[in-house]
Each structure stands twice: as C-alpha cells, then as structure tokens.
UniProtKB/Swiss-Prot annotation:
Listed PANTHER family: TRANSCRIPTIONAL REGULATORY PROTEIN YEBC-RELATED, TRANSLATIONAL ACTIVATOR OF CYTOCHROME C OXIDASE 1
Molecular function GO terms recorded: DNA binding
GO biological process: regulation of DNA-templated transcription
Family: Belongs to the TACO1 family.
Localization terms from the record: Cytoplasm
Leader sequence segment: none
Tagged with keyword DNA-binding: yes
Pfam families: TACO1_YebC_N, Transcrip_reg
Protein name: Probable transcriptional regulatory protein CF0838
Keywords, ordered alphabetically: Cytoplasm, DNA-binding, Transcription, Transcription regulation
GO CC terms, sorted: cytosol
C-alpha cells in the first residue's frame, strides 16, 4: 500500500497520516472546482458536482468552505484542474508513482524536478514503473468502527478481493475498479462506515532494499508528498 514500509517508523507514519488528511480535503475541493467548470454550479443539473458536494460533507468539510469554493469555481479567473501522473525510480530499484491534480502542469513538473534534484531518484518515461502495479478500487473503513473479523466477513459477502491492514487508521477493502461503487454501496447497506473510496495502485511485487536505500527512499517520498499539487504517492518498497 502507499507509504507502507518497514523503514517507516511510528513518528513518520503519524506525520504522514496527519498530512494525508489535509491532502484528502484539498483533493475534494479541487474536484469540486473541476466539476463546476465542466458542468456548471447547480448541483440539481450537475450530477458529478452533486456527488462531490456529498463527498465533501461526508468528510466534514464546513459548508462555508464548500460555498466559498463553489463561487470561486464560477469565476473566469479560476483555472480548471487536471490529473497528471509521474513515474520515478528511487534507490535500490524501488518504483514510485505520483498522482497529482493541478491547474498548472508546468509548475507541478518543475516541483517534481526539484524533488529529484534534492532527494535523488530519476523521473522516467510513462509505463516504466506502472507495469509493476495493479489498479484497484479501495474503500477506507476506520479501524475504530468495526472488528477486523466482522469486516472480513462482509468483504467476502460483497465479493471484494482483499482486506488490507497496513494503513495506520483504516482497513482498506480492495476490489476491481469497475466494482468500486457497488462494493461501497453494499458495505454501507451492511452498516459499514466507508469514509473514502477511490482508485489506487497496489504493487504486484515488492523490492527489498537495505537500510540506507530505504531511508533515502522515505526522504524522497516525504518530499514528494509535501508538493502542494500531489495527492498520492505509491511505491513498491518492502
């Protein structure tokens, strides 16, 4: 799973979890702005916007923040956001995938080059790293909301593929991307709390590197995660 490694200590994982929460809110706001740009500011006639507004409410984003960004999105000065993906090789042959949502691709590309210049690794051509990963749907279930054995029973019942326990705060229910909406709806119908659902990358194989390379990779990943436009960083380091 993204960010999980034997070289990541408790302090690193706690800081990453706190940082990730902010990234989730930021991503939702960018999705909201993009939905308005594509389909207009009225959720009654813009189904995509309606879904994202509900998503924002589920994430406890304040209503005033939602309204402010709806107005912001309607401004001609506000650029639209687009998804971009970067692939890198870190130390010891570790593959890294970076997903970002940006209103300025040149700025984001520059930030990526700075990260590599400062922390090492190399940016590579599209497809050079992706073949080591599989695209999966993921539903995030708070660990304090359900017992793992009970959730596993539900996972089997709804036909999901796997249950991942690596995340610090959530169980992650994995499924085929095309089944994500259905799996989430079935879990919710069974009383399971799903705080987030999205598509993620899961490594097909992991790379075991030494402590020096492991720590260097974590430093690179931490730098990448702090880039404003970056939403998620995936790697295949053991």
């Amino acid at each position: 799973m993204a960010g999980h490694s034997k070289w990541a200590n408790t302090k690193y994982r706690k800081e990453r979890a706190d940082h990730k929460r902010g990234k989730i809110f930021s991503r939702t706001i960018k999705e909201l702005i993009s939905a308005v740009k594509m389909g207009g500011p009225d959720p009654k006639t813009n189904a995509r916007l309606r879904v994202i507004i509900q998503k924002a409410k589920d994430q406890n984003i304040p209503s005033e923040n939602i309204e402010r960004n709806l107005k912001k999105a309607s401004s001609a000065d506000q650029k639209n956001f687009e998804d971009v993906t970067y692939e890198l090789y870190g130390y010891g042959g570790v593959g890294i995938i970076v997903e970002a949502m940006t209103d300025n691709k040149n700025r984001t590309a520059s930030d990526m080059r700075i990260a590599v210049n400062k922390r090492g690794g190399s940016l590579v051509e599209p497809g050079s790293v992706l073949y080591n990963f599989s695209r999966k749907g993921a539903c995030y279930v708070p660990k304090n909301s359900i017992d793992e054995a009970a959730l596993l029973s539900h996972v089997i019942e709804v036909g999901a593929e796997d249950l991942d326990n690596d995340d610090e705060e959530h169980f992650v229910v994995l499924c085929d991307p095309v089944d994500l909406s259905s799996v989430k709806e079935q879990l919710v119908a069974l009383g399971v709390t799903c705080t987030e659902e999205k598509l993620i990358y899961v490594p097909l194989r992991v790379v075991d590197c030494d402590e020096k390379d492991g720590e260097a990779n974590l430093a690179l990943i931490e730098w990448l995660e702090k880039i404003d436009d970056v939403d998620e960083v995936y790697h295949n380091m053991a």
